[in-house]
Amino acid sequence: MAFNKTYIRVGYSCMGMLVGFSAFLVWNIAYKQPWTAAMGGLSGVLALWALVTHIMYIQDYWRTWLKGLKFFMAMGVIFSVLSIVAFISFLCVAISRQQSLTDPTSLYLSCVWSFMSLKWSFLLTLYSHRYRKEFADISILNDF
């Protein structure tokens, strides 16, 4: 029996959520680096939104709530822009302060987590768009 891609996406989103939230806790408690913690937490929240998107797709809730998918797409775009701005800002500040790449409190790790947030916001936008397109086609067919 073939394994459905959606279930792989659910597992991947669960893993991303756990890693993002653990990064939030580690960089807040152990390293006292709030910027890296914030971007790790944002990555975890975006992975959680992607997980919710997949679960609602599996449970067929999106068919009746296409505006919700439009909202998720808008949030994905907004957080993509925010992540790009954060990545560039952290990179510029880390270079200007001549921080070490191996230091766990440097802003280079904030750049990494900004990129991870960008990845999850892009995936949130992509999956919301795909699911919306699929259900929009089905709703057009149901009108006849």
Curated annotation (Swiss-Prot):
Protein's GO biological process: erythrocyte development; heme transport
Motif segment (Di-leucine motif): 140-141
Disrupted gene: phenotype observed: Mutant embryos show severe erythropoietic defect.
GO molecular function, one term: heme transmembrane transporter activity
Bilayer topology: Multi-pass membrane protein
Membrane-spanning intervals of the chain: 10-30, 38-58, 71-91, 107-127
Entry's localization field: Endosome membrane; Lysosome membrane; Cytoplasmic vesicle, Phagosome membrane
InterPro entries: HRG
Primary localisation category: membrane
Gene Ontology cellular component annotations, sorted alphabetically: endosome membrane; lysosomal membrane; lysosome; phagocytic vesicle membrane; plasma membrane
Tissue expression: Expressed throughout the embryo, including the central nervous system.
Keyword Transport part of the UniProt annotation: yes
Claim: Transmembrane is one of the keywords in the record: yes
A Pfam family the protein falls into: HRG
Catalytically driven reaction(s): heme b(in) = heme b(out)
Keywords: Cytoplasmic vesicle, Endosome, Lysosome, Membrane, Transmembrane, Transmembrane helix, Transport
Family statement drawn from the similarity comment of this UniProt entry: Belongs to the HRG family.
Chain's role: Heme transporter that regulates intracellular heme availability through the endosomal or lysosomal compartment. In macrophages, is the heme transporter for heme-iron recycling. Essential for macrophage iron homeostasis, transports heme from the phagolysosome to the cytoplasm during erythrophagocytosis (EP).
Protein name as catalogued: Heme transporter hrg1-A
